[in-house]
Amino acid sequence: MYQIIKREQFGPVTFLWEVVAPEVAKACHPGHFVMVRTDETGERIPLTVADFDRAKGTVTVVIQAVGKTTHQMMGLAEGTSVLDFIGPLGVASHLEKREKVVLVGGGLGVAPVFPQLRLHKELGSYTISIIGFRSKDLMFWDDKFAMYSDEFRVATDDGSFGTKGFVTVVLDQVLKEHKGIGEVIAIGPLPMMKACAELTRSYGIRTMVSLNSIMVDGTGMCGSCRVTVGSKMKFACVDGPDFDGHLVNFDELMLRQKRFECEEKECLQRFEAERKRLAELGEGGANPAVPVGRKRPGIEDLAALPEVIPPPATRVVKNMRTIAPKRTPMPEQDPQVRSRNFEEVAQGYTMDMALAEADRCLQCKKPRCVPGCPVGIDIPGFISALGRKDLKDSYRILKSANTLPAVCGRVCPQEVQCEATCIVGNKLEPVAIGRLERFVADFAVGRGWDKAPEGKPTGKKAAVVGSGPASLACAGDLIKAGVDVTVYEALHVAGGVLKYGIPEFRLPNDTIDIEIEALAKLGVKFELDCIIGKLFTIPQLMSEMGYDTVFVATGAGSPKFMGIPGEAYNGVVSANE
């Protein structure tokens, strides 16, 4: 948890938080942003760093309540805590000493431009700062800007303070008055930044803008912050947020900013209506409760089945003529039901179904299914153990080769791997190996069969970057080999692409969580909200943090674009988003 040690209200919907986050503060630089999540049910909100104090271990953000979540955030009092404060994210601003530099902040953009002003002053640049607000009543930080500015000017839309008009009116005056301006930095609403960039274009002055206002997810995976810069597609949260304003396609960007406008408005209206209803009931307008996730439909409660099951009757010798020609069908949700939910479609085998399908395996002396499996599971072995109802041994065989049997049993493409090489499949339907793997893994849940390795610890430490399937498999193998393993995940939940890339009707989140919990029981440690490369670097891991090796498995998060017209339009998504 991250405590809010200072809260200040600047206007009706603008407020400041100073948050205790020592590691984030230590790694912060101008231009960085953080992702904030207030609680388990909250959404991720990107906030540009407005200030940081490495000595105090605090980071300051200035927030404007626009949607439901930011309105909820505005209700949090000083002294309360937020669940996640992830950062620093983005690429730090590249600043160097200039003869003269102009820093322009409009509205909320005043906050993120401040760290850049301070650093330029420390570098020895001659600083000219311009801040703009709708009126004097909404002004903030004019004292902080005056402290670090060689020249300080203010514009208000209504003329209640400083120059009447937009910041571009003042910027135009400054450009005409001063020679030797090496750079203009403009942060604020998109129309303001576009106007500043157009104003400086004829002067040939480098103009940097910050596109933090279009970010949603903060990792580049949602694609909401895509922006065309010159002839290239960029992601504001990964490649930015700072870009050359003369190269940014602002018209395209302003359309993209409206992408979720209707959804945000509807969500806020529902939130306000619910808050009003609760207030009328005398509950003080508390935040509406969020329902807990529903239980997935099932056809048999595997947890209710006994661990020790009587062995089956003696079976006859099997061959192609004696086994069932078709695989045992797996029950599924009725289409009329599943069209109205996101719960798992395939519901899994019952014990009788699993035994019937296991009986179709010929227990080949030279099985071709094993080399067809990428991790070399002893497939006849685990099916044989299942067939004699020794589920614990069947699970042991699976786990000895595969860290994630419940996941792989659901999403591994067995039809082109182990099942494609199944000898039964030469004449009949191949054995449903994946379905049997899933059954055994599901049966093992909650039975305590995942135990810490018995071998002696090696004394070695390994850091695993990312928590997707490659990382989890690596962590599982290393912990079994006696290595001390820590997994570092940038998001607030572990699972990587398993969580955010595969829908729950195909791979339920609770299945992923069970596999991760099994690894934790083996001794794997998970550090969430940790961005390796920003919060900690790999050289840091290998030196001061004492790791002997680092496995980097960050996945293929960035798509490749074709460079055709319309690629950045709303509604056009890449396969990675």
Q: What role is predicted for each listed range?
A:
Residues 68-216:
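FNR/FR-type flavoprotein reductase catalytic core
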Residues 107-110, 191, 221, 403, ...:
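Residue-level detector of alpha-helix initiation sites
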Residues 461-465, 513-564:
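Feature captures the FAD/FMN-dependent oxidoreductase FAD-binding
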Residues 462-486:
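N-terminal Rossmann-like FAD-binding beta1-loop-alpha1 element of flavoenzymes
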